[in-house]
């Protein structure tokens, strides 16, 4: 489930300007040669983070998912959850958020979870879903707290089947998460949107990457 075309196009443009979305030749962790790269760590100043929070908030509100709070898995998810709840508050919806520590504390407030009490319907927020490990850990922590995971919110759905360069799985990581946990995955943008953006772009240098992206999707995409 991706955001509407306007929000998606604006986000893709924003990611390109921030050099978070790049085109060229990049080797993925799975050993595949990808014609594009998405690195959410490039949203690294106040203005970019503020804008990013608004894109996440808009995608979440447009999804019509019912939720009570956000949860950001360490480490990237912490900043994303904070930015998004600020954007939601600016839009008139004040919701709590929480996150986890990588290692439990045995002093002070202790425990693994930090922030608001984890309860009600919880949206997990992250940048992308690669192997789904972060989501599985988050679902486990949320359920152990007695709350209900209700959706996963990400920036980009690569729409790419799992596996390696040689061994290609039947499903994408997003599809696997949706099937395993019965949770909808909401994305601000997806690969279909990126390809549509390239197709419509008046920037020849940018649109020249479309054949490589299409070939990559034909080989590894869903």
UniProtKB/Swiss-Prot annotation:
Cofactor(s), by name = Mg(2+)
Its EC number is 2.4.2.10
- Annotated pathway, please? Pyrimidine metabolism; UMP biosynthesis via de novo pathway; UMP from orotate: step 1/2
Provide one Gene Ontology cellular component.
cytoplasm
Q: Which sites bind orotate? A: 37-38, 130, 158
What role is this protein assigned?
Catalyzes the transfer of a ribosyl phosphate group from 5-phosphoribose 1-diphosphate to orotate, leading to the formation of orotidine monophosphate (OMP).
Q: Subunit details for this protein?
A: Homodimer.
Q: What is this protein called?
A: Orotate phosphoribosyltransferase
Write down the species.
Polynucleobacter asymbioticus (strain DSM 18221 / CIP 109841 / QLW-P1DMWA-1) (Polynucleobacter necessarius subsp. asymbioticus)
Gene for this chain: pyrE
